[in-house]
């Protein structure tokens, strides 16, 4: 492999391609003369669009093919949305860099209404996220929640075709695709706690590839890493996946981190919440500690019941 070349495995969706192009541009800016190639590929998650994620295997659906490409030395790195990255990595691969986070909030998108509170009784809302469904149902049990799969453009088209009165998307994706004008309102973290890692881009590579790791190092954003580490640690301890409504969101003020988390029933009938504060350098420990608090408050019974049905 040429010392001056790097190959990026990426999904083919417009948002995934934006993320890969972003990393490509950053590498070219930092390392003049470097040759960066994009290797777009389809993942199982991109192909299976008629079934809710919770029923077809969850987060790993969006990364496995990219990881195989790296293990087979067809690619050097893979670029991911952090909220799609599973807890565990295949042997020989690891998460080398987490880039600076975009807006982590959820976005309310509608052509008719400005916010969830404005929706009329019995309105139809589209989202495939059990985390979002749970929190919406808790505040608005009258709403009809329908699954919504596909890339951002497909989801917006379904809204525009009248299949939904509103849809909920990650704000970061709309911002990156220059579709901010479609956002009717941002949903605060207090109203809808984001998914762990939402809005952050991660770069995975072979853990023994020192050449690539050195090239990637300048893209690391330490504050984002602390936040995402805490959120993922909570999720890991809870053994969370796509089939359980789990929210986690860390904020940093100086050296102090505040991490909020929740576990809920998919129908929104019960939500268990917690918050913890401590040094940002203890990010992983804070995540585990908050998970333990949630479990002690009754999250375990919710998780056991959900997994029993899965």
Curated annotation (Swiss-Prot):
SUPFAM superfamilies in UniProt: Periplasmic binding protein-like II, Porphobilinogen deaminase (hydroxymethylbilane synthase), C-terminal domain
Any single GO CC term annotated in Swiss-Prot or TrEMBL for this entry: cytoplasm
Any Gene Ontology biological process: protoporphyrinogen IX biosynthetic process
Keywords: Porphyrin biosynthesis, Transferase
Enzyme Commission number: 2.5.1.61
Modified sites of kind S-(dipyrrolylmethanemethyl)cysteine: 242
One Pfam family per UniProt: Porphobil_deamC
Function: Tetrapolymerization of the monopyrrole PBG into the hydroxymethylbilane pre-uroporphyrinogen in several discrete steps.
NCBIfam families: hemC
Subunit structure: Monomer.
Protein name: Porphobilinogen deaminase
Name of the gene this protein is made from: hemC
